């Protein structure tokens, strides 16, 4: 976790950064037949101050939105809003091809307080998507980018303005490889493996 680089410690305590947060899903059911043609999933706080980019997205691709704070009066033609769900119900409600991890007021880059936060810390949203069986899309300058590229469980982009072209150049076979890897990572997340690994190091 890159935030550790920003912290100066004056103690002798052993620290260990989680690669990604675990996310337990009761009664998980694996998805089949995912396709890269599906909409991009955005789940979480959809309010202007955290997700203002939702109101200035390009016309493609399509987006499926889940969460609170969304201003439906400003909904774009390529957005479908499904409302909010209880945490245990949300994973099974998600529909799409990729989960998007993006914050801030701009679709050009992750900006503002919430966008800058992604440089240094991991998002629980990423764990939700992966644990639910979806590959993810992350900002190229985010703390999660290296993890995603190393595990080949998603893609990174510098701007959402580039996303249509990136997806057009991604073959169905390449997408299915991302799905396979995302499901493998997701299983470890659901089992609590990343926390257990951290505890083993600390012990």
Where are these regions (language model features)?
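Nucleotide-sugar-dependent
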Residues: 91-132, 138-146
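A short acidic, amphipathic alpha-helical/loop segment
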Residues: 6, 52-56, 166
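Conserved catalytic-core segment of nucleotide-activated headgroup transferases in glycan assembly
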Residues: 17-95
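A short, active-site helix/loop in glycosyltransferases that binds the activated sugar's phosphate group
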Residues: 1-15, 147
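Alpha-helix capping/helix-boundary segments
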Residues: 2-6, 47, 136, 143-144, ...
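A short acidic/histidine/glycine-rich donor-binding loop in glycosyltransferase catalytic cores
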Residues: 151-157
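A charged, aromatic-enriched C-terminal amphipathic alpha-helix characteristic of glycosyltransferases
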Residues: 32, 158-161, 165-167, 172-203
């Amino acid at each position: 976790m890159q935030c550790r680089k920003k912290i100066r410690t004056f103690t002798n305590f052993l620290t260990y950064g989680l690669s990604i947060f675990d996310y337990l899903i009761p009664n998980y059911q694996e998805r089949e037949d995912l396709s890269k043609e599906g909409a991009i999933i955005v789940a979480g706080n959809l309010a202007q101050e955290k997700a203002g980019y939702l109101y200035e997205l390009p016309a493609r691709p399509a987006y499926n939105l889940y969460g609170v704070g969304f201003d439906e009066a400003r909904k774009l033609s390529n957005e479908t809003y499904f409302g909010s769900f209880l945490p245990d119900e949300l994973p099974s409600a998600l529909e799409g091809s990729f989960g998007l991890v993006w914050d801030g007021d701009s679709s050009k880059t992750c900006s503002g307080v919430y966008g800058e936060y992604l440089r240094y810390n991991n998002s629980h949203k990423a764990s939700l998507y992966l644990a639910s069986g979806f590959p993810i899309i992350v900002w190229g300058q985010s703390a999660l980018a290296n993890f995603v590229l190393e595990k080949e469980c998603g893609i990174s982009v510098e701007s959402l303005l580039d996303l249509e072209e990136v997806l057009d150049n991604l073959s169905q076979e390449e997408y299915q490889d991302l799905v396979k890897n995302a499901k493998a990572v997701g299983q470890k997340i659901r089992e609590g493996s990343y926390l257990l690994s951290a505890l083993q190091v600390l012990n």
